Design a protein with these regions (language model features):
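Formylglycine-dependent sulfatase
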Residues: 19-398
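Hydrophobic h-region of N-terminal signal peptides that target proteins for export
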Residues: 6-17
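Positively charged n-region of N-terminal signal peptides that target proteins for export
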Residues: 1-3
Length: 399
């Protein structure tokens, strides 16, 4: 009997020491890319030191809640002042000037170079990552997300798939009402299903959710427009239908956050949010995009910033930019300047890379800043150039 007890104890000890605990699952990363959303368009300040860095009319309680759960970057920049160059830049971690607008399609065609995309880099770090892109793709080269490494997507989509009616005369002077404006519900439901599937299979995932809102045409739910028609208008923002379109987007962000909370994965999930460029200066625009950047009057929709979409003044390239996730102190701000082509390096470091800047990238990881808002900017300059379908001009962000 004594021999049996000693044998049982020895077996238990050996068994306990030979069990190898599983490594923690790699963090999930969700990147939400809004369209044409200005730096001061939210109802929460993008810079706590600047009272004017929020809207005097728009209501975005859910986006504000996400912003305040993490760190806002007061000097976050889109790579370009229009959508397609920004989206290409984010995908590869390269500056738009390196990519070039005219030759991008031929130079970056899959198989013709060694450039890596976000999903390809993440899978090199951890092959278990499952990746998805839903919404506005809009690289404008006829190559879908799957060809650049995404496991799931809804194809080579542009503004048209977001119920944008490309009638220039109506684009800004009219608004449209729909029950599923800008495919907001469709995208949100698809996103929730994808996330649930990966959680059930214990897969780490990367998801880019590229909303069609708030790009023209202006489209919102009728009841949301009616609500804003009853709210006193501001001096800076006063377009009820555009405010409603943003509010419908905001509601979908709240639905997504609630879904993550219900799944219990917020502690292992990073959420990044930014816009592809600044907002338009006026709704409707009062100038031709080929005009000199000084041709517009004041005030404007992006105040206190100057300019807007299509220009390289601050209003055209400085955008809402914030991150929520593990070990990120809530309701904090960083004055470090960051840009969209820094995201790939940052995602790589979050996924576990010890050398996130080793993938032939132009951007730098800012992961260190996520736990320390006092981290200063690096010594580089940010360069911007508007070289196609616009008045040629450049900008440099330094210091």
């Amino acid at each position: 009997m004594r021999y049996f007890l000693w044998f049982s104890l020895l077996f238990s000890l050996l068994n306990s020491t030979t069990q190898i605990p599983k490594d923690p699952i790699s963090p999930n990363i969700i990147f939400i890319l809004a369209d044409d959303l200005g730096w001061s368009s939210l109802s929460e300040q993008m810079d706590p030191a600047m009272p004017g860095s929020k809207s005097d009319y728009h209501l975005t309680p859910n986006i504000d809640r996400l912003l305040k759960s993490g760190m806002r970057f007061t000097q976050g920049y889109a790579p370009a002042s229009i959508c397609s160059p920004t989206r290409r830049s984010i995908l590869f971690g390269h500056t738009p000037m390196r990519q070039d607008d005219e030759s991008f399609g031929s130079r970056y065609e899959p198989g013709k170079n060694s450039f890596l995309t976000i999903p390809q880099v993440l899978k090199k770090i951890n092959p278990e990552y499952v990746t998805a892109h839903f919404g506005k793709w809009d690289l404008r080269i006829g190559i879908p997300p799957a060809s650049f490494g995404y496991d799931f997507s809804d194809g080579d989509n542009g503004n048209g798939q977001g119920n944008t009616i490309n009638t220039k005369d109506e684009k800004w002077t009219t608004f449209f009402t729909e029950d599923n404006p800008k495919q907001i519900d469709t995208l949100t439901n698809r996103t929730k299903r994808f996330i649930s599937d990966q959680v059930n299979q214990n897969n780490p995932f990367f998801l880019q959710l590229s909303h069609y809102a708030t790009h023209a045409n202006i489209t919102a739910r009728a009841e949301t427009i009616a609500r804003f028609e009853k709210i006193p208008k501001g001096d800076k923002h006063h377009h009820a239908a555009w405010a409603a379109m943003l509010a419908d987007l905001d509601a979908s962000i709240g639905e997504l956050i609630s879904h993550l909370d219900q799944l219990g994965i917020r502690k292992n999930t990073y959420l990044f949010f930014m816009s592809d460029n600044g907002g338009v200066e006026f709704i409707a625009p009062v100038k031709n995009r080929l005009d000199h950047p000084d041709s517009f009057p004041s005030p404007m929709c992006n105040a206190p910033l100057r300019g807007g979409k299509w220009t390289l003044f601050e209003g055209g390239i400085r955008v809402p930019f914030f991150v929520s996730g593990p070990d990120i102190p809530a309701n904090t701000s960083s004055n470090r300047y960051v840009t969209g082509y820094d995201l790939l390096a940052t995602f790589a470091e979050i996924a576990g890379s010890k050398q996130p800047n080793s993938f032939s990238l132009d951007g730098n990881s800012f992961k260190a800043s996520l736990s320390n808002p006092k981290t200063t900017s690096d010594s580089r300059n940010l360069y911007f150039h508007r070289f196609n379908n616009g008045y040629p001009h450049s900008a440099v962000r330094s210091g």
